[in-house]
Each structure stands twice: as structure tokens, then as C-alpha cells.
């Protein structure tokens, strides 16, 4: 069970927050809604989970109804836009009973006296739909998946070449997301893709491979960072495809730095509170044994002397020189039994205390301070006396890899928007604005990137709430209006759903 504890004080602050400032000041009643130079009669949205309305760790009907493309389409209908169809799932829980790993949505429940996000149990099987759908957002899709044939082939699900979310509504087993979008002959399109090309690496704690320089995505694993040229080429193929059916007008967005979202910013690096007695014990049993050895090896700063109050988590950093043999030899020469010396050397050869440059995954909360099976005290406490594995932490070097890839992606996306004459949404800049202490305000309600209390992000810490998607919808609307001289009104984020409390 995932246990992310939310204090009652935080809930009160969420429910009572107000502000005299607002970023939503236009009087909608005075706007004459027009399409300007655009034709909204057939709008198709391409993208990934963010486009589909995915939130709370699942795809469910109410979330889909509050997808940002659905909000945009609603405003387009006031300016000649047509119907906007979505491949709605059959329930408000999400997940699939017949596909392993696809759980139902997260909900807030009281666990041991604290509000905690807990996954639901899926109630529906993977359904197969017919017809065409304006919302072509596919959760989990990377840039190159949009142009991949067989991505909706049920036979490829076990091997990972197909995606069950596209299997649901693909027109055939051999089609691609792009081909099904083209078949609708759109007059206008939106494209927001690229997040997953780096996000899966980040949410896995960097256990994938940075594939920069490898332009063959068929060799990638699911948690790898996509080569920037592969991303740019895939997006160019999508844009050429849209142009080939006459959809020369549209809007494209860049991607936020994924490390700025609550999944990576909620758990602090110094999440270990110690009293005087426990700090002294750990200093004597662990730090005191290792730090002199590390200091002699010129690596004394790997471990910090523990203090009363908040202390850094102990992590494994695979970029560090492995000092297992040196630690083992030093301990043995100091009279430590051979078996214990070998264990300590192996366990702490690449261990260090986390710093503010490391990011702790939201899902790691349930692991910290748990016992490691088969390891004796005092060395068995995850993140305290036993180093957290790489999958639980983004180290500063991994954060840097993500930043470099994101910057490269965004440079290409901006250039492609200019080359194809499209409206451009700077989603990265909006995320930075949301991340500021003041957040942004809409009609007296403040939105930020804070987990749960910020109002923008859902319980999975990665995807948005209905209100968060409304904030994004407005960025698309503003970009469309600026480029095509349309007058689509913005939506009011406060009219959409946020976190639901029990």
C-alpha cells in the first residue's frame, strides 16, 4: 500500500486559500467568439497521458471528460467547432482486470489516522471500441510511438510493442496513432508529446539508459531516454502527416522539466528525523566506522555526521568509485570479523548521504525506514542505515541527464513550431510559474505544484487534476488566439474538479 501521509493542516490550507490577485481577468460575456484565421470544424488532439485526461494513476471517464483537449473543443464549438469524441473507459475507476499492472485510480483514504493515497481495484476488462475519436491521446506513448505501426495490435502487448490504451480504440491492428488521426481529415490539431521520452527514466529512478546517440528506438527499453534526434524526427513525421491531409494549422507544446513536478519534489532529501540518542547510536555504529576510512581514501564527504533533527537519506550512487574492497580491507585490519567486514564493504562501497541536488521519488515514502529482508540490525533500515537503491532516487547526475535531454527536446519543438507555422505553447515556462512560491491565481484560488495542497496535480504526483488541465487548456487557447487571431474564451479552472477528499 502506498502511504503518502497528508496532514490535516495542509488540507485546511488547501480548502481555505484565497487571494486578491487573479490571472483570469477577462470578462467572457463581452467577447465575440470567432475562429479568426483557423477552421475548428474538425479538431484532433494527439499526445500521451496528459492529452487523454489521465490522472490519479489511472485513466477513468470523469478524468477524460476533463481532458484539456475536451475543454479547448468546448470553446471551439462557440466558433464553428464540431463534435469532439473521446474513447471513454466504461467506469470511473480505471485500470484493467485482465492486464497485469493496470490498477484502478488512487483515492484518498484514512490509513492509520492519516489521509493517504491508495490504489483502487480495477473492475473492468480491456474493452475494444469502434469508430473514430478526436482525442488521440495515448497514456504511456513516447514521441516515436505515435508513428509506430502495430502500436494498437493486441498481439504485441506481451512483448511491449503495443499499448493497451491504443489497443482499445485503434482502427486496426496495423495502424498507427498518426494514421488514425489523419484518417479523420482534421482542419485543426494539437500536439503535446515528448514528456514520456524522459519521464519514464525519471520515475524509474534513472534505472534506464540514456540513448542519446542511438537513433534506433526499436532497441530501447521502456525506461530509456529517447535520443533527441529521434524525438525531433518523430514529431516532424507527425507534422508532415497533418500537412498531407490539409491540417496546416495547429498548436504544439514543449515539455516541462519533469523534475519540477510533485513526484520529485515532495519528499525532502533530509527526510530522516533523529533524536539525540538515535543520532549518537548511528554515529557510533555506522558513520564512526566508515567515515575515517573514507576520509583516508579522500572520500570523507560521502557521509555526514548525524545530528539531532533532520538528516539526509542514505543512498547508493552508482557514479561513485566502488570502494567495497578498500572498506573491507580496512575493517578487517581493524579486527572486524571477515564476514561482517565484507558485508559492510559491499553494502557501503558506493553509499553516500543525499544532498539537495538529489531528488527522492514520491513512491519512496513507503520504503524509507522499512526493514531490509535478511539484513541484521542496525544495518537494515532503508534510507537510514541501508542505502536506498538507485530506483528510489534521482541522483544529481541523473537529474542533469534529464535536464540536458529536456532542453534538447524543447529546442527542437520550438524550431518545428516555427518551421511549420504553428501556434506554440511554452508549457515549461508555465510549470516554472506554477512552481514559484506565489503560484498562479484564478478568481481567488491559488494553484501551485505543491502535492495535493497546490490544486494542480493529482494524487499520482505526475498528472494534473481537472483544474490543472484547465490551466493548461488556457495556455493552448492563448497561443491559438495569438497565432490565428481567434477569440476563443479561456475556461475557468475553478469550475473543474480537484483532489477529492473522503
Language-model-derived ranges and their functions:
Residues 21-502:
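Conserved active-site regions of diverse hydrolases
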Residues 1-4:
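Positively charged n-region of N-terminal signal peptides that target proteins for export
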Residues 11-12:
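Repetitive helical segments and hydrophobic/amphipathic motifs
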Residues 15-19:
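C-terminal motif of bacterial Sec signal peptides marking the signal peptidase cleavage site
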Amino acid at each position: 500500500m502506498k502511504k503518502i501521509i497528508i496532514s490535516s493542516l495542509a488540507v485546511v490550507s488547501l480548502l481555505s486559500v484565497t487571494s486578491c490577485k487573479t490571472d483570469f481577468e477577462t470578462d467572457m460575456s463581452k467577447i465575440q467568439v470567432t475562429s479568426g484565421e483557423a477552421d475548428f470544424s474538425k479538431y484532433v488532439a494527439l499526445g500521451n497521458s496528459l492529452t487523454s485526461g489521465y490522472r490519479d494513476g489511472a485513466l477513468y471517464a470523469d478524468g477524460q471528460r476533463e481532458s484539456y483537449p475536451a475543454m479547448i473543443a468546448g470553446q471551439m464549438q462557440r466558433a464553428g467547432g464540431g463534435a469532439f469524441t473521446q474513447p471513454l473507459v466504461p467506469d470511473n475507476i480505471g485500470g484493467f482486470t485482465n492486464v497485469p499492472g493496470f490498477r484502478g485510480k488512487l483515492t484518498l483514504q484514512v490509513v492509520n489516522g492519516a489521509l493517504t493515497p491508495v490504489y483502487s481495484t480495477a473492475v473492468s476488462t480491456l474493452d475494444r471500441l469502434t469508430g473514430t475519436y478526436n482525442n488521440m491521446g495515448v497514456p504511456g506513448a513516447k514521441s516515436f510511438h505515435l508513428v509506430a505501426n502495430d502500436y494498437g495490435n493486441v498481439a504485441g502487448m506481451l512483448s511491449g510493442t503495443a499499448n493497451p490504451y491504443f489497443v482499445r480504440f485503434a482502427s486496426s491492428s496495423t495502424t498507427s496513432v498518426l494514421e488514425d488521426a489523419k484518417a479523420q481529415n482534421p482542419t485543426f490539431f494539437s500536439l503535446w508529446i515528448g514528456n514520456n521520452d524522459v519521464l519514464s527514466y525519471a520515475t524509474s529512478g534513472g534505472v534506464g539508459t540514456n540513448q542519446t546517440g542511438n537513433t534506433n528506438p526499436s532497441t530501447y527499453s521502456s525506461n530509456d531516454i529517447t535520443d533527441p534526434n529521434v524525438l525531433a524526427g518523430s514529431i516532424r513525421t507527425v507534422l508532415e502527416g497533418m500537412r498531407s491531409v490539409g491540417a496546416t494549422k495547429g498548436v504544439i507544446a514543449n515539455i516541462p522539466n519533469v523534475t519540477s513536478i510533485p513526484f520529485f519534489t515532495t519528499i525532502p532529501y533530509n527526510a530522516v528525523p533523529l533524536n539525540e540518542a538515535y543520532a549518537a547510536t548511528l554515529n557510533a555504529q555506522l558513520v564512526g566506522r566508515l567515515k575515517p576510512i573514507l576520509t583516508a581514501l579522500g572520500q570523507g564527504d560521502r557521509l555526514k555526521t548525524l545530528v539531532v533533527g533532520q538528516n539526509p537519506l542514505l543512498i547508493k550512487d552508482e557514479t561513485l568509485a566502488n570502494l567495497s574492497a578498500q572498506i573491507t580491507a580496512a575493517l578487517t585490519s581493524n579486527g572486524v570479523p571477515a564476514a561482517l567486514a565484507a558485508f559492510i564493504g559491499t553494502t557501503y562501497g558506493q553509499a553516500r548521504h543525499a544532498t539537495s541536488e538529489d531528488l527522492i521519488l514520491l513512491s519512496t515514502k513507503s520504503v524509507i525506514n522499512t526493514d531490509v529482508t535478511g539484513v541484521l540490525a542496525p544495518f537494515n533500515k532503508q534510507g537510514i542505515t541501508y542505502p536506498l537503491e538507485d530506483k528510489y532516487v534521482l541522483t544529481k547526475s541523473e537529474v542533469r541527464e534529464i535536464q540536458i535531454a529536456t532542453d534538447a527536446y524543447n529546442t527542437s519543438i520550438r524550431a518545428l513550431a516555427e518551421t511549420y507555422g504553428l501556434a506554440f505553447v511554452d508549457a515549461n515556462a508555465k510549470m516554472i510559474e506554477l512552481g514559484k512560491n506565489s503560484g498562479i491565481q484564478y478568481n481567488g484560488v491559488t494553484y501551485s505544484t505543491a502535492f495535493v495542497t497546490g490544486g494542480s496535480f493529482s494524487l499520482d504526483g505526475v498528472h494534473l487534476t481537472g483544474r490543472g488541465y484547465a490551466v493548461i487548456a488556457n495556455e493552448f487557447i492563448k497561443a491559438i488566439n495569438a497565432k490565428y487571431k481567434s477569440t476563443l474564451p479561456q475556461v475557468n479552472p475553478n469550475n473543474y474538479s480537484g483532489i477529492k477528499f473522503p
